[in-house]
């Protein structure tokens, strides 16, 4: 005679061996190594398929129209897979690879249109990533869309003379996203995806920003693009970063109910002003300290780890640049 779990629990309870309600059926989870292998298999399958298509239809890479059509089709297929098979590891990774390939084909097609400038291509890419962010609910893909879409927008604005202020702009957007993580519970997952995408872009800018910035400035000079603010642009940008540091500390104090007239509030604002002054000479100090601060305030270990990594990486890079 077989006994179900509920009856067995009732018998044990009558004998005084257990107490309380019967435990729910355990949720069966796939081991992490199996999920990893399924994800890798999805990428391998997608790239084999794309390699076959690339060899058999080489004309796609040579025609702007064909590249745009095939790229858009791949993005559409990836969106369909994400929305219908969102829980499968193989399917989600396969769709992610298809989406990346589609995005690369779209960029390839846009670059082959001779009349289009870099800023126009970057704006189209930013709009594409915004659309994919809204259509695809996969968290990792959303982080990718937020990072690449923001990077494309930065590239477009840089070509219009806003290059010195881009780090401050990314920093402000990052701070706003994480300070409002819990403001809209229904959208908290999307806000976190935006926040992670922006912090990755911010860290990349901190690590390679100095070298890339000098190269970018030379390119803009040759292209005849004048920077807004002229010779004062770097100082204005550094002052903006310092102001954002003070603003973040002020918002966190308000959130915690600490008055500025109290001793802890005065100490926090004083420390923020000190970091802001240091940031005028080394903007990365203020940026990385805020990443650490927001990570600690929100209880986010990933942000804390990224903050520590970015602080150490920036200090190493800054020391190297002083040599």
Give residue spans per PLM region.
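Alpha-helical multi-pass membrane segments and their bilayer interfacial helix-loop junctions
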Residues: 1-323
């Amino acid at each position: 005679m077989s006994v179900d779990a509920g009856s067995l629990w009732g018998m044990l309870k009558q004998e005084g061996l257990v107490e309380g309600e019967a435990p729910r059926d355990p949720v069966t989870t796939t081991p992490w190594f199996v999920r990893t292998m399924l994800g890798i298999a999805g990428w391998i399958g997608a790239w084999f398929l794309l390699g076959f298509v690339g060899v058999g239809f080489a004309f796609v890479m040579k025609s702007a129209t064909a590249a745009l059509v095939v790229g858009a089709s791949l993005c559409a297929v990836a969106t369909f897979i994400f929305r219908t098979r969102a829980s499968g590891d193989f399917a989600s990774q396969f769709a992610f690879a298809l989406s990346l390939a589609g995005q690369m084909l779209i960029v390839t097609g846009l670059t082959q249109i001779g009349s289009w400038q870099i800023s126009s291509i970057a704006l189209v890419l930013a709009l594409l990533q915004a659309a994919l962010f809204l259509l695809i609910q996969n968290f990792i893909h959303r982080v990718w869309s937020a990072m690449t879409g923001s990077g494309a927008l930065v590239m477009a604005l840089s070509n219009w003379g806003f290059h010195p202020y881009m780090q401050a702009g990314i920093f402000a957007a990052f701070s706003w996203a994480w300070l409002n993580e819990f403001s809209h519970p229904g959208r908290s997952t999307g806000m976190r995806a935006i926040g992670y995408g922006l912090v990755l872009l911010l860290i990349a800018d901190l690590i390679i920003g100095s070298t890339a910035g000098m190269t970018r400035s030379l390119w803009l000079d040759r292209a005849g693009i004048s920077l807004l603010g002229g010779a004062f642009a770097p100082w204005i940008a550094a002052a903006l970063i310092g102001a954002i540091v003070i603003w973040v500390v002020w918002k966190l104090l308000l959130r915690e109910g600490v008055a500025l007239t109290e001793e802890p509030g005065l100490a926090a604002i004083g420390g923020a002003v000190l970091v802001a002054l240091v940031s005028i000479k080394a903007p990365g100090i203020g940026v990385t300290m805020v990443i650490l601060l927001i990570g600690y305030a929100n209880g986010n270990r990933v942000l804390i780890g990224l903050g520590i990594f970015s602080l150490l990486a920036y200090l190493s890079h800054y020391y190297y640049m002083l040599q």
